[in-house]
Structures are given as structure tokens and as C-alpha cells.
């Protein structure tokens, strides 16, 4: 639906799956934040030109932020849905029991239950690599328009995590929308309508 909106509004549109996700090659357990950041940069560098607005959900929100920091001349705006920057260290690692943490460090991985699919492996490489890309502990020097959509009933990314991001990004043109009955995916009809309206707003604000 977002692609249809973009085409109708006269905007280009590019979507992709990170390696080990969706239709892309690779295994999830081989993935790291460094690798997925490289995927995002490669997609933008190879398949787009001019100013771009990045739309990222959950981990994709972290990737959008890292991409904006790496390509400040290219990124004209950000739309972040339930953004999860630093999730490996600040959300995931503290939730693991001492036994699971030990298993990751000694065995190299542990299986994490999922509400959406089969349990999936969280690797030592993912955790340790994620520590090199933490961005919430200092001001995030992004000065383009930013829009954040966050569900208050999100069971995966606490809304306070998104609120912390609001306080960390330097942009003065930042709007944080907290959807009181919204979950993590924000995929209901009203959520999609809100997302499209938000994209239209930021396209105007960014003049992209």
C-alpha cells in the first residue's frame, strides 16, 4: 500500500529485504548489524539518486538512523515505526536469563521464542557487533525532518525506548506520535492510513 501511495504521489519507491530476511539470500543467524547496515547503504547507493526519505520499522528504524548518519547528503527525512535502535544491547541482552547469556557466550547462540514464527537464533556475533553501533548514548546528529510512530501496547519495543530516541536526535523538526492502542506492527487499516499521511507530511516537509 505504501508503494501504491508513493507512485500515485509521484515519488520513486524502493523496498528490500535484509540478508537472511524475507526473500533475500543468506541465513538470519549469519547476520549482524554491520551486515544489515551495509545492505541498506548498498541499496540506496546502487538503486537511488537524489534525496531520499527512509521508512524503517523496528530494526529497520535502527538501520534508517545508521544510514542517515552515513549518508547525510542523501537522506532528506526519516519515518520510523516502532524504531529499535541499540536493541541488541538495550532491549534484548537484558531480557536474557543468565543461563541464556552464558549459552550465547559459550555456545555462540541461543534460541529466542517469537510471537510471529518459530524460535530464532540470537548469536554472539550479533550481540557483540551490535555494541559497535550503539547510538542512544550520545546526541544523534540528524537534522532532517523525523516522524516517529509508536504503539503504546508494543510488546517488543517499549514506547519509552522511542521516547528516549526523541530526546537524543538533534533535529528540531521531529514529531512523535504515540498510538495508545497500537501494537508493534502497526499494520491495521488505520495504522496504514496514518503511515501514508505521515509520509505525505514528511515529503512536504523535506521537499523531496
What are these regions (language model features)?
Residues 142, 148-150, 154:
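Short beta-strand/loop motif that positions the catalytic acidic residue
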Residues 3-25:
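Conserved alpha/beta-hydrolase
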Residues 169-185:
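Catalytic histidine neighborhood in serine/cysteine hydrolases
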Residues 144, 158-167:
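Short alpha-helix in the alpha/beta-hydrolase fold that links the catalytic acid
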Residues 22-47:
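Catalytic nucleophile-loop/oxyanion-hole region of alpha/beta-hydrolase
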Amino acid at each position: 500500500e505504501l508503494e501504491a501511495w508513493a507512485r500515485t504521489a509521484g515519488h520513486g519507491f524502493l523496498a528490500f529485504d535484509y540478508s537472511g530476511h524475507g526473500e533475500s539470500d543468506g541465513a538470519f543467524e549469519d547476520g549482524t548489524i554491520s551486515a544489515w547496515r551495509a545492505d541498506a547503504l548498498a541499496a540506496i547507493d546502487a538503486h537511488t539518486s537524489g534525496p531520499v526519505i527512509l521508512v524503517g520499522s523496528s530494526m529497520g528504524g535502527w538501520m534508517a538512523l545508521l544510514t542517515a548518519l552515513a549518508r547525510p547528503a542523501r537522506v532528506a527525512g526519516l519515518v520510523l515505526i516502532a524504531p529499535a535502535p541499540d536493541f541488541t544491547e538495550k532491549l534484548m541482552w537484558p531480557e536474557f536469563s543468565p543461563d541464556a547469556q552464558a549459552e550465547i557466550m559459550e555456545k555462540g547462540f541461543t534460541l529466542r521464542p517469537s510471537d510471529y514464527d518459530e524460535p530464532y537464533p540470537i548469536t554472539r556475533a550479533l550481540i557483540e557487533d551490535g555494541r559497535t553501533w550503539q547510538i542512544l548514548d550520545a546526541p544523534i546528529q540528524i537534522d532532517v525532518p523525523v516522524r516517529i510512530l509508536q504503539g503504546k501496547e508494543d510488546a517488543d519495543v517499549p514506547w519509552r525506548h522511542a521516547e528516549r530516541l526523541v530526546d537524543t536526535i538533534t533535529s528540531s523538526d521531529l514529531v512523535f506520535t504515540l498510538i495508545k492502542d497500537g501494537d508493534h506492527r502497526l499494520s491495521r487499516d488505520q495504522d496504514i492510513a496514518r503511515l501514508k499521511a505521515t509520509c505525505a507530511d514528511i515529503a512536504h516537509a523535506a521537499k523531496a
